[in-house]
Structure formats: C-alpha cells, structure tokens
C-alpha cells in the first residue's frame, strides 16, 4: 500500500496544506476486467483537498471516499467531487462508494445547500459506517473503530498488500479526530504506520475533542506501532512543539505530516 497526504492542516485549510485528506492506494485485480490496476481510496476530503488531489492521481479514478466524521473540515470538498463526477466534459463518471457516520447524505446536502430532492444517485453510493464492520475496496480492507470526539466519529485500520511484497499483508491506521479511548488504541495495535491527529497541545485543556502530541505518543507506545505520524496540527501551532510533547511518551520513529508526503507500507 501507499499512503499520500493530500491535506493535513487541523480544523481548516492552511497556508501550506489543505485540510484533512489521505489517499490510500494498492495494486489489485479489477473484478470487472480481471486486470490489475491501482485502487484509490480517500479517507476524508476537507476544504481544498479535492483540487490538491489532482497533483497525485487522475481524480476520475477515485474508487471510494470514507469519512471519519461529518465536521466540515473533513468533508467540505465532497461538493467539488460531486460536481466533477456529474458534470465532467465527456459525461457523468458514475457513482462511487461514499461512506461515513449516520446522517451522511443529509450532511452532504447541507454542505451543498440543496434540499432532500437531491439524491446524488449518479455520483455516490452511500454507506453508513458501523464499528467493526469492514469495507473492502479492491485489495484493501478498511475497518472503522469508534473515536472519542464531539460528534459520532471513527478511525480506520487499513489492511492491504505490501508495496515490497504483494503477497504480504500489512496494516496502517488513521485516527480521524479523537481523544484517547480504548477503541483507538485497539485500532492501532501493531500497525506499521499510525497517522494520528494531534490537534491540541498541552496548553489546550478541553477533553473529548482532540489528542495532544503527548497523548498521541502514549497511544503509539501502548499500541506498539512502528512509525507515528502526527497530523491535524493547527496552522498556528509549531509542529516542533507537538513532536517535543510526543517525545514525552514515545521513543520510536516519528514525523509530522505535510502535504505531498508519501509512505510506502
């Protein structure tokens, strides 16, 4: 599998990155043609991310979009995706899987500013996430785990073929937005890469909203991950501060996400 950071700024688009969006890719057999091809799945599609995605893939080739939760900084560019798929110059591109928490399509209509008569049937096949029920896209499996956030939210554990050896299965995990909770620790156990939000620093006191670097580091330590990548850092926060806080708990490999970063798993 390959993971590309399309956008990673916390809570909004920023001067150096769009808001949250992560592209996961893997080579597998197309069930319709029997030929091998690259499958493309997006986890979240925040403001500015759809345009940025064009730097990395042909946007017509998206197979699925999975939303960790329905806050605008993680879903707003679904409207751009809808317009692209409905009005592409050579004709409609057809529906793709759109998965998220309960209330998904009402939220999409709200962002789009349309009423219940809009079904998006030509662009999206909606699916409501259920904790522990995996979604399979090509050779990849995405299993949602409940997160600890202000609205219903999930993290994803992703299993798929190794880039180095397609016969080997490897795993990564993405927290979405969350504070510490047992289910997110379970999600991260033993993965090669944990993409963990760190939207707060130690100076931020509210709980049940975001992780700090320190709390993300503690999750990485307890879960036994190989690489911790900190993301969803606010544009006013120095990433070095978040790294320093994570180092209070985590002694392993660590980095901060940035737009365009790629990781082969």
Regions found by a protein language model. Give the residues of each.
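Cap/insert and terminal regions of metallo-dependent hydrolase folds
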Residues: 180-264
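Binuclear metal-dependent hydrolase catalytic cores
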Residues: 1-174, 179, 184-186, 243-265
């Amino acid at each position: 599998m390959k993971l590309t950071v399309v956008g990673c700024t916390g809570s909004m688009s920023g001067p150096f990155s769009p808001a949250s969006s992560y592209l996961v890719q893997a080579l597998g057999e197309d069930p319709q043609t029997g030929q091998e091809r690259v499958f493309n799945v997006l986890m979240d599609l925040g403001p500015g991310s759809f345009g940025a995605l064009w730097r990395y893939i042909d946007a017509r080739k998206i197979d699925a979009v999975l939303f960790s939760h329905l806050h605008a900084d993680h879903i707003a560019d679904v409207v751009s995706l809808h317009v692209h798929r409905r009005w592409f110059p050579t004709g409609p591109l057809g529906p793709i899987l759109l998965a998220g928490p309960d209330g998904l399509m009402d939220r999409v209509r709200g962002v789009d500013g349309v009423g219940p008569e809009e079904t998006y049937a030509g662009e999206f096949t909606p699916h409501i996430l259920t904790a522990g029920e995996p979604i399979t896209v090509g050779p990849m499996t995405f299993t949602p785990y409940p997160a600890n956030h202000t609205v219903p939210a999930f993290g994803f554990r992703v299993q798929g073929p190794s880039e180095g050896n397609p016969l080997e299965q490897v795993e990564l995990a993405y927290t979405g937005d969350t504070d510490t909770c047992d289910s997110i620790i379970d999600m991260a156990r033993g993965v090669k890469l944990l993409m963990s939000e760190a939207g707060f620093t130690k100076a931020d006191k509210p709980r049940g909203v975001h992780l700090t670097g320190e709390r993300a580091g503690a999750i990485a330590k307890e879960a036994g991950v190989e690489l911790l990548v900190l993301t969803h850092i606010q544009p006013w926060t120095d990433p070095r501060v978040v790294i320093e806080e994570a180092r209070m708990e985590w002694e392993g490999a660590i980095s901060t996400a940035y737009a365009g970063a790629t990781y082969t798993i």
